[in-house]
UniProtKB/Swiss-Prot annotation:
Organism of provenance: Escherichia coli (strain K12)
HAMAP family: Arg_succ_lyase (MF_00006)
Enzyme Commission numbers on file: 4.3.2.1
Protein's gene: argH
Protein name: Argininosuccinate lyase
Catalytic activity: 2-(N(omega)-L-arginino)succinate = fumarate + L-arginine
Class of this enzyme: lyase
Family membership noted in the UniProt record: Belongs to the lyase 1 family. Argininosuccinate lyase subfamily.
Keyword match DNA-binding: no
One of the record's GO cellular component terms: cytosol
Primary subcellular site in the record, as a coarse category: cytoplasm
Amino acid sequence: MALWGGRFTQAADQRFKQFNDSLRFDYRLAEQDIVGSVAWSKALVTVGVLTAEEQAQLEEALNVLLEDVRARPQQILESDAEDIHSWVEGKLIDKVGQLGKKLHTGRSRNDQVATDLKLWCKDTVSELLTANRQLQSALVETAQNNQDAVMPGYTHLQRAQPVTFAHWCLAYVEMLARDESRLQDALKRLDVSPLGCGALAGTAYEIDREQLAGWLGFASATRNSLDSVSDRDHVLELLSAAAIGMVHLSRFAEDLIFFNTGEAGFVELSDRVTSGSSLMPQKKNPDALELIRGKCGRVQGALTGMMMTLKGLPLAYNKDMQEDKEGLFDALDTWLDCLHMAALVLDGIQVKRPRCQEAAQQGYANATELADYLVAKGVPFREAHHIVGEAVVEAIRQGKPLEDLPLSELQKFSQVIDEDVYPILSLQSCLDKRAAKGGVSPQQVAQAIAFAQARLG
């Protein structure tokens, strides 16, 4: 059933109808559209459009429809309705007859779809927050179990300084905590209802929009009708949060893909999240992680596309805004799937401590400790930096780690070096000295784990 047509003397071309219709994707707003319609029916009672008995009949029919949709959502796609609003209204009229035609009094699809989408976003943010915190918890648990797994830290993908696998896990906990904060912050701006703003100028009925907002679970009602039907900031905000969150997951995936290579060999992924080759029997490919990394691009594309769609629109509703849903639905679905998959990857990961330790002992990751040792002996840091660089060149020439160079060799570079240098060059000493807040020392890592556990509950 079309919600318009009296103005027209010709039927829509079938090609235009297919081009214009949005039911194939906005069917996902069915539950929100029905819930919003129940609230609107209550508001119509307060202004005398509906009697209490009529409202009760409408609400009962809408609730039956809601249960039917939950049981069989795909039924919606069997219809040729233009959009989800048309479908719900048509089904309602099928159930209650002419009474169903009174429900849209004082309401526009402009404020209706804005309300539906905000309700959907609120529900989806709740799911994302749960999945985000589950992944944080998985990372904290992995950190808890690997506090003694020493491995090389990298800059420029070159071995730099020793860290622990726990410290690496906690870095991603921090990123995910920021993602969580962004979602919680977005909820504050989502929590205002546009219902009752009409097409653009407000409704002609003296509806208490604050009461209406409360019935729908919103904190308040919007303050300007023109802005309310024009606003898609919440779509951009959530796409931006998703884009940033997926960058974090992509980096997480890239790190683990590298750690899982034969060349690094720091971890082994579970068979449950890997696949094989159709040709090479020995292969065990990190497909779950590669897909997380690859899906990052489609989420970035959704954000860019929505920015370009909105940038030139005049105020109030334009049909361009129908393009807000497919990208948003796909981006948030993708982010949610990737959060779940990242947690699954961690569930079966094996950290190969001996190999991590071996790699940490290579690459002169303790060179900074020698420079700090020289500074403690009174050598200016820039000079100490140069001295240690020369010592590293000599160690490389001899094929030895720094700590295996005899004292006589080290003293060729600086006479202040003494026997007390050797304990300082040990990996454990390198870790222990990083005891300032946020550092990699065992004490700091343990405190960070405890803090994260307390925050996550």
